[in-house]
Amino acid sequence: MELLIKNARIIDAIQDFKGDIYIKDGVINEIAQEIKKDNVEVLNCEEKILMPAFIDTHAHFRDPGLTCKEDLESGSKAALRGGYTGVCLMANTKPICSSKEVVQYVRDKSKELDLIDIHQCISVTQNFDGKTLDHLNEFKDDNEVKAISDDGVGVSNSNIMLEAMKIAKENNWVLMSHAESPEFSKSDMRIAENMMTIRDVELAKLSGAHVHMCHVSTKEALKCIIAAKDEGANITLEVTPHHIGLTKEINDYRVNPPIREKEDVEEIIKAIKMGNVDTIGTDHAPHTLEEKSKGSPGMVGLETAFPICYTKLVRENGVSLNELSKLMSLNPARLLGMNKGRISIGVEADLVLIDIDKKIKVDSNEFVSKGRNTPFEGMEYYGEVLATIKSGKIKYKK
């Protein structure tokens, strides 16, 4: 399989130049200002932006068990339409991903579909019971496991969380923290996030584990995490497109953690500009319209992430496309131990072609995700994904 990409503006975390890319056997084989090859498939970019495909550090595909909301195929196709070729899936499936059987189902189905790379999180506690860690022993020799998380509920018992962090460190896993203190969940969601953030940061320092703080949304939590990172703690910091693109004044859509105040959004953008944020994760969380009408928290995000982030960060706040690529591609690849997220000879050819000058209007009827739950309906942003390439094959083309 050969593909020649012509006339692209090539951008990754450190590069920005015009040129061609030749892909052979799924890998970037040659990069130059001009490449000529006979009898190969050609993609003419017409000077549009070509970036490393995005990798989502935080998504929910609801498969197995909740496939009325999403499944591995629909979620993967939504990812491709949004420019993503890799996702890290949370464990809140049905049954919860606490067993080898569930993990193997996801892996086998993913390979059968052959659409994107899927990394399935293991639950921190068995079946989210908040106390049992024995199931983690099953995965100690499984090199495909990258991360563990009780995302959606969190781990309220501090001793259990510390022990889980120690296990994660022993196995070189990332522990993904959903920072929410249950004591405050019903009364004050700001305090709920802040209190649990403080605890998990301190436990991360104590254990030495790599702790990934998911969907950080308050200015206080940001300050706490950044201070710990500055001290050398092995912590990475994730924010979402909706916590960048919305404030309570614009749309108080139900999501967990909630849409925050203007000052919180300003601090998130400031942290990004200062280089203190590591990844952008969509927290793609599809629901049926019936469930959403009853108050289920969450929104779909894979198909709108880039235009929201590009518009809000690059166009409106002066963040470079290089930095955005770092947040959406390079750093997520590093987090998950993937040889991706950059444009270099010998790297797997996962790429996305984007028209950054094209204005789009969000229309949930055009989503390929089963989910239609979005607060961005009818809003306009810049940046349209034209094509997504996975291992040198064009998997999505508008």
Curated annotation (Swiss-Prot):
GO molecular function, one term: zinc ion binding
Protein name: Dihydroorotase
Biological process according to GO: 'de novo' UMP biosynthetic process; purine nucleobase catabolic process
Record-listed Zn(2+) 2 binding positions: 151, 178, 215
Record function comment: Catalyzes the reversible cyclization of carbamoyl aspartate to dihydroorotate.
EC number of this enzyme: 3.5.2.3
Pfam families: Amidohydro_1
UniProt binding sites for substrate: 60-62, 92, 256, 287, 297-298
Keyword field: Hydrolase, Metal-binding, Pyrimidine biosynthesis, Zinc
Cleaved signal peptide residues: none
Cofactor note as given: Binds 2 Zn(2+) ions per subunit.
Cofactor(s) required, per the database record: Zn(2+)
Binding site for Zn(2+) 1: 58, 60, 151, 283
Lineage: Bacteria, Bacillati, Bacillota, Clostridia, Eubacteriales
Gene3D superfamilies: Metal-dependent hydrolases
Pathway: Pyrimidine metabolism; UMP biosynthesis via de novo pathway; (S)-dihydroorotate from bicarbonate: step 3/3
Protein source organism: Clostridium botulinum (strain Eklund 17B / Type B)
Catalytic center residues: 283
Origin superkingdom: Bacteria
HAMAP family in alphabetical order: PyrC_classI_B
Reactions mediated catalytically: (S)-dihydroorotate + H2O = N-carbamoyl-L-aspartate + H(+)
Family assignment from sequence similarity: Belongs to the metallo-dependent hydrolases superfamily. DHOase family. Class I DHOase subfamily.
